[in-house]
Structure formats: C-alpha cells, structure tokens
Amino acid sequence: MDARLLQLPWRSLRIADCIFMGKVCFTESSYALLLSDLSSMWCEEAKADIIQDRARELNKRLKAPVSSFLSYLSQIVFPVLNSKDNGQNIFSCHRSEAELLLQVKSQLSGLPFYWSFHCKEATVSTVCRHLVRPLKSMTEALESQNQELCLLLKKKDAEIQEYQDSGAVLTRDRLKTEVFDELKFQKSFLAEKVQGLCMSGKAPGFSEQLQQLYDAVIAPKAPTHPKEEDTGNSASHRPMAESSSISFEKTVPTQERTEGGAVSEPSQVPQSSVSCLTHRPPAGASKPKKKAKGLFM
C-alpha cells in the first residue's frame, strides 16, 4: 500500500485554520492516508477488520460491507482534496501528542454518516521516502535545469552579438537586453526573490509544474508491484473505482426484520478501474507556437 501511495501526487487540504498537504489511496478492503503541515507528518493505514469495527461503532444505524463504506468514504474525500471549499463543513481535526484525529461528518440516505481517521506520527523513514528524498532529487533537477538555461542565455547573447557585428540593428528598443551575467543574477535572486518567497506564507503543497517534477523523480524509484496471485483475496487489494456503487441497509429491530431483508451485495468493480484520490485530469493540448518574427534587419 505504501508503494502505491508513494506514486500519488500531493494535494492541499484546508480544515478551519489548519492547512495540510496530503495523499490517500483506497482499495476494497483498506486505505492509507498521509498528511503533513510541513512541521509534522501523520499517517494511517487501516485494514478490513479495523474498518469494520470502526464503522459499527460510529454508524450503528447503517449496515454494509467494508467495501461499501470505503467506496462512500472515497466519494467524500476525493472532491475535497484541492477544492476551493476544502471541506469546511465536512472535516474537523483535533491534535494531541499521540495522534491527529481527522473526523468526517456527512449524510447518507437521510442518516448521519461519521468517520474518524486516527493518524499517528509518521516514522522518519516515511518522511524521507515521501518528502525528503523526492525534494532533494527535485532540487538537483532544478539546479541542472538552471545551469542549462544559463548556458542557453550565454549562447543567445553570443548569437545577438554576431548579428550586431554583421551590422544588424534592433528595430524594437523595448526588446533590448543587457548581456546576461550569471553571478549578478544569482545574487539578485537570492537577495530579492528568496526572502520574499520564504515570508509569503503560501499554503503547503506543490504547484502544477513542481508536482510534475515530483512525479518524474518518484516514477523510476517506485517499486513495481509483484503480480497478484490468483486467490480469492486478491480482489480486495486492488484499487477501488471512484464510481463504485454503494449498498447500505438501515438497521431495524430484530423482530421487524423479514427473511427477505438481506443486505444487497455491492456491484463488482472492474480490475482495471483505479481509485487514486489525488488523480489529476490530463493536461490539455499545447497551443501551437507562433511563427518567429525577425528582430533584426
């Protein structure tokens, strides 16, 4: 489950005054949740037995298979991640020294639905695997990109100088630039930009471009999953479809139940369907580049 969670992008989650970056993955019989406010990191991985006991404790008037509870829970969590509303009326959180308690309150078939994520402080290895190592790789990649851009700018300056030596004249003065000085640029950037970024108080999380970079550095390192054995339990470990149907039954006193009051089974979920709750829609097609116009004559 942790390997599957590692490959998911980080998304932002705002609950009252608390701002987190998080990722979550559901299967038909378990889930894994990871949250961080960049001061601490918390996680919970729950199996079927824990989920069943917690569902009975929190929702005494609802009866359903574990897969149905997880399906409905996923449909609550998914729209909240990275949304503008960010679940102000759905989620609440309480911190203690031992855990971060993330509580969910919703409605299902006219009845209240409750859930609690009991997140423990993540281990150092988890923090390193999901944040420290990827961030180090991202930093190295950005440094390499910066060096390539500096080389490109120097080549452009040399190209412009050659045009000027040939007698070319710039027709638009507003496009005139100074010769690129890498050392001067770095000093200016550190003095003017970096301090402003550190003091901006921006919510934790990655921009779209940084998230793509995170995905790129994670992809080659994420372990591949061994082929699942053909057993009766293999289906319960497959990622759950976001649109899985939900089958719940309201509990009634025993003397009022009839022999035909059995709980209907949830519909089967295709093996190819995936419930990555931090799924990002595919990027749109890039616009065609404009034809370059000459600046010298």
Curated annotation (Swiss-Prot):
Region called C-terminal tail, residue ranges: 220-286
Biased amino acid composition, Low complexity: 263-286
Biased composition, class Polar residues, residue ranges: 232-255
Annotated spans, Globular head: 1-131
Keyword Kinase carried by entry: no
Subunit composition and interactions: Homodimer. Interacts with xrcc4; the interaction is direct and is mediated via a head-to-head interaction between N-terminal head regions. Component of the core long-range non-homologous end joining (NHEJ) complex (also named DNA-PK complex) composed of prkdc/DNA-PKcs, lig4, xrcc4, xrcc6/Ku70, xrcc5/Ku80 and nhej1/xlf.
Family designation: Belongs to the XRCC4-XLF family. XLF subfamily.
Protein name as catalogued: Non-homologous end-joining factor 1
Organism expressing this protein natively: Xenopus laevis
